[in-house]
Amino acid sequence: MFEKNGDTFLNGNLLIVGTTASGKSSLAIELARRRKNVEIISVDSMAIYRGMNIGTATPTVEEQEEIPHHVIDIVDPSDEFALPLFQSAVEKALKEISNRGNRAVLVGGTGLHVRAVVDRLEIPPRFLSIRDEIELIPETSFLYRKLNDLDPIASAKIEPGNRRRIVRALEVTLGTGRPFSSFGPGLDVYPPSPFTQIGIRTVSYTHLRAHETRHDLVCRLLLE
């Protein structure tokens, strides 16, 4: 597979996506072993945290010493690492890899984080003081009507009772002076991808057992 199609795959950077325990990381490592100019970037919302190795199938120390890995074990679980920071970390890794003349293989496990990188989502900033003021208003229905006045496109896509999303939309709209719906390409717009993409779909006894094994390990750690 790699010898036949490797040149096609690695004319640019490669993105491998798939379900939990589908073998994404193993495929990336095997590809990197066969092509010496490959470095791996994790696109997983949990792998960024230290100490999450079992729950996220983080590559072993030996694998990370053999093949350069990026955006893994970079913050503590108690630290906040918002999506824009994640985007910046991946973009920095991509630039450094390119400067070395190498190719990147991105391994994606979290849908939103993959999309933030691939589709270059524009993530609106947070405005905590504005949010605190909005939260002082108890009537969610009033907030929804206010959102509908300011950004009817956003309100049409948010359930009237979903206070968390309503507050966030108002926070961004009031804080930036732009409609919340103007951020990002939206769920129905897909710009050209800068990556060759491979999706792994595995539904088998072996896959189910791998998923169960991971689940058992996590449960055992929580109970100890």
Predicted stretch roles:
Residues 2-209, 214:
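Phosphate/pyrophosphate-binding catalytic cores of soluble transferases and nucleic-acid-acting enzymes
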Residues 210-224:
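Positively charged, low-complexity/disordered segments
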